[in-house]
């Protein structure tokens, strides 16, 4: 199990070009290549996972499939920290063996037969690595694409700052630095 600490900022699509040109991001080293991610989120028809603040997602990145389980996030001042479990998704079947919390795994196994796709996202992700000071490492991910549920569709455009190493306050400092130039956010 890992704990993800992140700050997500929803952006208007028109802000993307300026954000990419911001010196903080434009001069940062890239983490991998820009990729397209396809995600399907699952729940029961009664949305019981959502009710319990849990999520099950399958993600296709290139030719690789991953299954992710996330639990309720503790949100403090806009930062969210949540337990998550990730493992390969193979043979088009759910496998919750990586979930090391018995209560979560048992609940997922109970819901497993009734899990259905609820919505999908497809977006391009650009990732850079920010190291604002020694001992701090932040992934800055710009996502641009769509979210679809049934016949409905909406644009998805966000900046996600994920703390890999360091103090969570560094996420705020980076967001404030990006916001100083009003053209970028």
State each model region's role:
Residues 1-183:
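Phosphate-end processing signature that detects enzymes handling 5′-triphosphorylated RNA
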